[in-house]
From Swiss-Prot:
GO terms for cellular component: cytosol. One of its GO terms (molecular function) is DNA binding. HAMAP family: Transcrip_reg_TACO1. It is found in: Cytoplasm. The keyword Glycoprotein does not apply. It comes from Acholeplasma laidlawii (strain PG-8A). Signal peptide: none annotated. GO terms for biological process: regulation of DNA-templated transcription. This is Probable transcriptional regulatory protein ACL_0044. Pfam families: TACO1_YebC_N, Transcrip_reg. The keyword ATP-binding does not apply. Keywords: Cytoplasm, DNA-binding, Transcription, Transcription regulation.
Length: 239
Protein backbone atom coordinates (compact mmCIF):
# COMPACT_ATOMS: atom_id res chain seq x y z
CA UNK A 1 0.00 0.00 0.00
CA UNK A 2 3.15 2.06 0.34
CA UNK A 3 3.98 5.71 0.02
CA UNK A 4 0.46 6.91 0.59
CA UNK A 5 1.42 10.57 0.78
CA UNK A 6 4.00 10.58 -2.01
CA UNK A 7 1.50 10.52 -4.88
CA UNK A 8 -0.40 13.43 -3.43
CA UNK A 9 2.76 15.36 -2.53
CA UNK A 10 4.13 14.92 -6.05
CA UNK A 11 0.92 16.27 -7.51
CA UNK A 12 0.78 19.25 -5.20
CA UNK A 13 4.47 20.01 -5.72
CA UNK A 14 3.85 20.53 -9.42
CA UNK A 15 1.32 23.27 -8.74
CA UNK A 16 2.07 26.86 -7.84
CA UNK A 17 -0.67 26.63 -5.22
CA UNK A 18 -0.44 29.84 -3.22
CA UNK A 19 -0.97 30.02 0.52
CA UNK A 20 -4.22 31.84 -0.20
CA UNK A 21 -5.63 28.62 -1.70
CA UNK A 22 -4.71 26.66 1.43
CA UNK A 23 -6.18 29.40 3.62
CA UNK A 24 -9.37 29.47 1.59
CA UNK A 25 -9.79 25.69 1.70
CA UNK A 26 -9.29 25.45 5.44
CA UNK A 27 -11.41 28.54 5.99
CA UNK A 28 -14.34 26.76 4.37
CA UNK A 29 -13.73 23.55 6.31
CA UNK A 30 -13.46 25.38 9.64
CA UNK A 31 -16.59 27.41 8.92
CA UNK A 32 -18.63 24.33 7.97
CA UNK A 33 -17.41 22.29 10.95
CA UNK A 34 -18.25 25.15 13.33
CA UNK A 35 -21.64 25.65 11.71
CA UNK A 36 -22.51 21.94 11.78
CA UNK A 37 -21.81 21.63 15.52
CA UNK A 38 -20.82 24.02 18.26
CA UNK A 39 -18.25 26.73 17.47
CA UNK A 40 -16.08 25.49 20.35
CA UNK A 41 -13.30 23.03 19.39
CA UNK A 42 -13.31 21.62 22.93
CA UNK A 43 -16.82 20.27 22.43
CA UNK A 44 -16.80 19.88 18.63
CA UNK A 45 -14.35 17.13 17.68
CA UNK A 46 -14.76 17.68 13.93
CA UNK A 47 -13.85 21.35 14.35
CA UNK A 48 -10.93 20.43 16.59
CA UNK A 49 -9.49 18.07 13.96
CA UNK A 50 -9.80 20.62 11.16
CA UNK A 51 -8.08 23.28 13.26
CA UNK A 52 -5.24 20.89 14.12
CA UNK A 53 -4.69 20.11 10.43
CA UNK A 54 -4.93 23.78 9.51
CA UNK A 55 -2.25 24.71 12.03
CA UNK A 56 0.09 22.12 10.53
CA UNK A 57 -0.38 23.92 7.20
CA UNK A 58 0.54 27.25 8.87
CA UNK A 59 -3.00 28.62 8.62
CA UNK A 60 -3.00 31.72 10.81
CA UNK A 61 -4.92 32.08 14.06
CA UNK A 62 -6.72 35.09 12.56
CA UNK A 63 -8.15 33.03 9.70
CA UNK A 64 -9.23 30.28 12.09
CA UNK A 65 -10.95 32.77 14.42
CA UNK A 66 -12.56 34.69 11.57
CA UNK A 67 -14.26 31.60 10.17
CA UNK A 68 -15.42 30.39 13.59
CA UNK A 69 -16.85 33.86 14.25
CA UNK A 70 -18.60 33.77 10.88
CA UNK A 71 -20.30 30.52 11.90
CA UNK A 72 -21.21 32.02 15.28
CA UNK A 73 -22.74 35.01 13.54
CA UNK A 74 -25.32 32.85 11.81
CA UNK A 75 -24.07 33.34 8.25
CA UNK A 76 -26.33 31.61 5.74
CA UNK A 77 -23.33 30.79 3.54
CA UNK A 78 -23.35 27.06 2.85
CA UNK A 79 -21.02 24.58 1.18
CA UNK A 80 -21.70 21.08 -0.10
CA UNK A 81 -19.17 18.25 -0.15
CA UNK A 82 -19.09 16.78 -3.64
CA UNK A 83 -16.95 13.97 -5.04
CA UNK A 84 -16.20 13.44 -8.72
CA UNK A 85 -14.54 10.44 -10.34
CA UNK A 86 -12.84 10.45 -13.70
CA UNK A 87 -10.45 8.91 -16.18
CA UNK A 88 -7.39 10.85 -17.29
CA UNK A 89 -4.77 10.20 -20.00
CA UNK A 90 -4.04 6.51 -20.68
CA UNK A 91 -6.88 5.41 -18.41
CA UNK A 92 -5.46 6.95 -15.25
CA UNK A 93 -7.88 7.03 -12.33
CA UNK A 94 -8.70 10.27 -10.53
CA UNK A 95 -10.88 11.18 -7.54
CA UNK A 96 -11.68 14.84 -6.84
CA UNK A 97 -13.14 15.99 -3.54
CA UNK A 98 -14.75 19.42 -3.51
CA UNK A 99 -16.31 21.84 -1.05
CA UNK A 100 -18.49 24.24 -3.01
CA UNK A 101 -21.31 26.74 -2.74
CA UNK A 102 -22.15 26.34 -6.42
CA UNK A 103 -22.19 22.79 -7.76
CA UNK A 104 -22.98 23.90 -11.32
CA UNK A 105 -19.84 26.05 -11.41
CA UNK A 106 -17.72 23.29 -9.91
CA UNK A 107 -18.80 20.50 -12.26
CA UNK A 108 -18.37 22.85 -15.22
CA UNK A 109 -14.82 23.77 -14.18
CA UNK A 110 -13.86 20.15 -13.51
CA UNK A 111 -15.36 18.90 -16.79
CA UNK A 112 -13.51 21.55 -18.82
CA UNK A 113 -10.18 20.36 -17.43
CA UNK A 114 -10.95 16.72 -18.19
CA UNK A 115 -12.01 17.62 -21.72
CA UNK A 116 -8.76 19.53 -22.31
CA UNK A 117 -6.80 16.45 -21.24
CA UNK A 118 -8.96 14.18 -23.45
CA UNK A 119 -10.19 12.47 -20.31
CA UNK A 120 -13.74 12.03 -19.09
CA UNK A 121 -15.76 12.13 -15.91
CA UNK A 122 -17.24 8.83 -14.79
CA UNK A 123 -20.40 7.92 -12.94
CA UNK A 124 -20.39 7.51 -9.18
CA UNK A 125 -18.48 4.36 -8.24
CA UNK A 126 -16.70 3.96 -11.57
CA UNK A 127 -13.30 4.77 -10.03
CA UNK A 128 -13.92 4.59 -6.30
CA UNK A 129 -13.92 0.80 -6.13
CA UNK A 130 -10.27 0.76 -7.22
CA UNK A 131 -9.12 2.75 -4.17
CA UNK A 132 -8.97 2.03 -0.45
CA UNK A 133 -10.43 4.70 1.82
CA UNK A 134 -8.14 4.98 4.84
CA UNK A 135 -7.04 7.13 7.72
CA UNK A 136 -3.27 7.48 7.33
CA UNK A 137 -0.72 8.77 9.83
CA UNK A 138 3.04 9.15 9.42
CA UNK A 139 4.72 9.14 12.82
CA UNK A 140 8.41 9.52 13.61
CA UNK A 141 8.78 7.02 16.46
CA UNK A 142 10.31 3.63 17.27
CA UNK A 143 8.17 1.00 15.57
CA UNK A 144 7.78 -1.31 18.60
CA UNK A 145 6.96 1.55 20.96
CA UNK A 146 4.30 2.99 18.65
CA UNK A 147 2.64 -0.36 17.99
CA UNK A 148 2.59 -1.12 21.71
CA UNK A 149 0.89 2.21 22.44
CA UNK A 150 -1.73 1.58 19.76
CA UNK A 151 -2.37 -1.93 21.06
CA UNK A 152 -2.70 -0.77 24.67
CA UNK A 153 -5.30 1.78 23.59
CA UNK A 154 -7.33 -0.69 21.50
CA UNK A 155 -6.63 1.13 18.26
CA UNK A 156 -7.62 -1.04 15.32
CA UNK A 157 -5.13 -0.58 12.48
CA UNK A 158 -5.38 -2.40 9.17
CA UNK A 159 -1.71 -2.17 8.16
CA UNK A 160 1.52 -0.34 8.86
CA UNK A 161 4.93 0.26 7.29
CA UNK A 162 8.18 1.28 8.93
CA UNK A 163 11.05 2.90 7.07
CA UNK A 164 13.97 4.98 8.33
CA UNK A 165 12.38 5.72 11.69
CA UNK A 166 9.01 6.71 10.26
CA UNK A 167 5.98 4.49 10.82
CA UNK A 168 3.00 4.85 8.49
CA UNK A 169 -0.24 3.66 10.06
CA UNK A 170 -3.31 2.68 8.06
CA UNK A 171 -6.76 2.38 9.63
CA UNK A 172 -10.42 2.74 8.80
CA UNK A 173 -11.56 6.39 8.59
CA UNK A 174 -13.68 5.90 11.71
CA UNK A 175 -10.45 5.41 13.71
CA UNK A 176 -9.01 8.78 12.70
CA UNK A 177 -10.05 10.73 15.79
CA UNK A 178 -9.07 7.97 18.19
CA UNK A 179 -5.58 7.63 16.68
CA UNK A 180 -5.06 11.40 16.77
CA UNK A 181 -6.02 11.48 20.45
CA UNK A 182 -3.81 8.51 21.36
CA UNK A 183 -0.81 10.09 19.65
CA UNK A 184 -1.39 13.40 21.39
CA UNK A 185 -1.87 11.75 24.81
CA UNK A 186 1.47 9.98 24.37
CA UNK A 187 3.35 13.10 23.21
CA UNK A 188 3.70 11.80 19.67
CA UNK A 189 3.15 14.10 16.72
CA UNK A 190 2.30 12.93 13.23
CA UNK A 191 4.38 14.29 10.36
CA UNK A 192 1.39 13.82 8.07
CA UNK A 193 -2.17 12.73 8.66
CA UNK A 194 -5.24 12.52 6.47
CA UNK A 195 -8.26 10.53 5.47
CA UNK A 196 -7.46 9.68 1.89
CA UNK A 197 -8.03 7.42 -1.08
CA UNK A 198 -5.13 5.08 -1.80
CA UNK A 199 -4.97 3.31 -5.18
CA UNK A 200 -5.01 -0.48 -5.02
CA UNK A 201 -2.80 -0.54 -8.12
CA UNK A 202 -0.56 2.23 -9.44
CA UNK A 203 0.51 2.90 -13.01
CA UNK A 204 3.16 4.81 -14.95
CA UNK A 205 2.44 6.90 -18.02
CA UNK A 206 5.23 6.09 -20.47
CA UNK A 207 4.38 8.58 -23.21
CA UNK A 208 5.85 12.04 -22.35
CA UNK A 209 3.02 13.85 -24.13
CA UNK A 210 0.39 11.90 -22.22
CA UNK A 211 2.28 12.52 -18.98
CA UNK A 212 2.28 16.25 -19.73
CA UNK A 213 -1.49 16.15 -20.29
CA UNK A 214 -1.94 14.33 -17.00
CA UNK A 215 0.27 16.82 -15.13
CA UNK A 216 -1.70 19.76 -16.54
CA UNK A 217 -4.97 18.11 -15.55
CA UNK A 218 -3.87 17.50 -11.95
CA UNK A 219 -2.36 20.98 -11.68
CA UNK A 220 -5.56 22.54 -13.00
CA UNK A 221 -7.74 20.58 -10.60
CA UNK A 222 -5.58 21.49 -7.61
CA UNK A 223 -5.79 25.15 -8.56
CA UNK A 224 -9.60 25.27 -8.57
CA UNK A 225 -10.90 27.09 -5.49
CA UNK A 226 -13.65 24.53 -4.96
CA UNK A 227 -11.30 21.52 -4.98
CA UNK A 228 -10.30 20.24 -1.55
CA UNK A 229 -8.24 17.20 -2.55
CA UNK A 230 -7.20 15.17 -5.59
CA UNK A 231 -6.21 11.50 -5.52
CA UNK A 232 -4.96 9.38 -8.42
CA UNK A 233 -3.11 6.17 -9.26
CA UNK A 234 -0.18 7.54 -11.29
CA UNK A 235 3.43 7.39 -10.14
CA UNK A 236 6.24 8.98 -12.09
CA UNK A 237 9.09 6.93 -13.50
CA UNK A 238 11.75 6.30 -10.91
CA UNK A 239 9.43 6.50 -7.91
Amino acid sequence: MGRAFEVRKASMAKTAAAKSKVYSRYGREIYMAAKAGTPDPETNQALKRVIERAKKEQVTADIIKRNIDKAKGGSDENYAEIRYEGFGPEGSLIIIECLTDNTNRTISDVRKLFNKAYGKLGVSGSVLHQFDHKAVFEVEAPENKLLEILLENDVDITDYEAEEGVVTIYAEPTEYGKIADVLKDNNLESKEEAIMFIPMQTMEIKDPEEQAKFDRLIEGLNELDDVKDVFHNVISSGE
